[in-house]
Amino acid sequence: MFRRMTVSLMVGMLAASAVWADTPKPFPKFEAKRVKPPKPGSTNRINVFIEPKADDVPEVVATESGAIVPASPGQYDWFWDRVSPAVEKSGPGRLEAAMVTLATASSKIPAPRMQQMQEIAKANGIDILRSTIGTQVSPALVLAVITVESAGRPDAISGAGAQGLMQLMPDTATRFGVTDSMVPMQNIAGGVKYLDWLMGEFDRDPILVLAGYNAGEGSVHKHAGVPPFAETRDYVPKVLAAFQVAKGLCQTPPELISDGCVFAAMN
């Protein structure tokens, strides 16, 4: 019997030890510490440090001569070596010089495929023609802008918030009466109105008009010409290259960005 009691006692102790092993240790004892307010005139304060946020890196820098140049070069800086970005050189006649530059330069700007632009014209040609009636904007220019801006996708949305075929920013859309930028007809109408306004603002200068469409007319005025942003400096020749292709889709190719055009094929 004594042996049975001993065995039972040992089993009980082992079971108890297993329970104790699974029991977590108590939390350490914490005591609240009262901090007295500083005495009047004391300089001791609780300081909270927030890591300062770096300012945005400027997109332009000044040279020793005082000229403002892009902080990062664009892909087509050679274009601007031959076509002045300055507003003092503006005028509608600059289109010919710009197109000659594109055609004769050793470096080429990739132009959209004619088939791609033809498909965009088939899908949106009627809306483009309707929107450009009575304006200073060639349908061929609108087609070029649409191709470069959205590749013809009516649902395109940029990281900056530009929307639709002609990539209208919300403020620009509101400014020109667009209530839904995702509706192609409205988007095209708003984009054409903006281009038409820019044509009047910059005396039909194709270089400044396209720069204003990309960067805003305020930036063009601020920099007295094409803003020295790599994106804008690349955008202008890209649209002009697309305009050259778009001209070939017109029954009568336009000479200026204000000339009329009827696309050979439309839905």
Put a short name on every predicted segment.
Residues A111-E119, D127-I133, R153-G159, T174-P184, ...:
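Second-shell loop/turn segments in exported
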Residues A156-V178, G190-L195, M199, A211, ...:
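Substrate-binding/active-site groove segments that recognize
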Residues F2-M10, L14-T135, P139-L143, P237-N267:
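Cell-wall glycan-active module
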Residues A140-L143, Q163, L208:
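Structural motif
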Residues I146-A151, G190-Y194, R204-A230, Y235-L240, ...:
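Acidic helix/loop microenvironments that form the catalytic cleft of cell-wall polysaccharide enzymes
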